[in-house]
Amino acid sequence: MQGSAKHITIINTGCANISSVRFAFERLGAQVTVTDDTHTIARAERLILPGVGSAPAAMKSIKQKQLVECIQGLKQPVLGVCLGMQLMVTSSEENDLGNKANTACLDLIAGEVKRMQVNQLRI
């Protein structure tokens, strides 16, 4: 990042490897804030939505932190990383074991994350 340092806000979803994402942006010269505070998120200039793990667990954490409406109302640029990008769609076929229903996601992008069809291949 050239010139003055850019400020990046990482949304603390509770389901992410935040230290890796933070370190990557700091190496690029960015000033980084990590937060789950809705007021700080709403005022941020640029946002990162990271995620690791499963869609159901991440959405549960985002709901518990009362971040859904805040994230859905953002007008500024948001970069989804890994699971964070997947959570930006309407729903995911990934679900809790024993639950056949799709996981409702953030619905920022119309679409659905589909399971890979492996046709009996081991992955």
Please report, for each region that a protein language model flagged, where it lies by residue.
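Structural signature of beta-strand start/N-cap positions in the alpha/beta core
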Residues: 31, 46, 77-79
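Residues in the short beta-alpha loop(s) of Rossmann-like NAD(P)-binding domains
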Residues: 14, 38, 112
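Cysteine-nucleophile active-site neighborhood
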Residues: 55-123
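Generic structural signal for residues in well-ordered beta-strands
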Residues: 31-32, 113
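Extreme N-terminus of proteins, especially the signal/transit-peptide cleavage junction
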Residues: 1-7
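Short acidic/histidine-rich motifs immediately flanking catalytic phosphotransfer sites
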Residues: 41-51
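N-terminal beta1-alpha1 ligand-phosphate binding loop
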Residues: 8-30
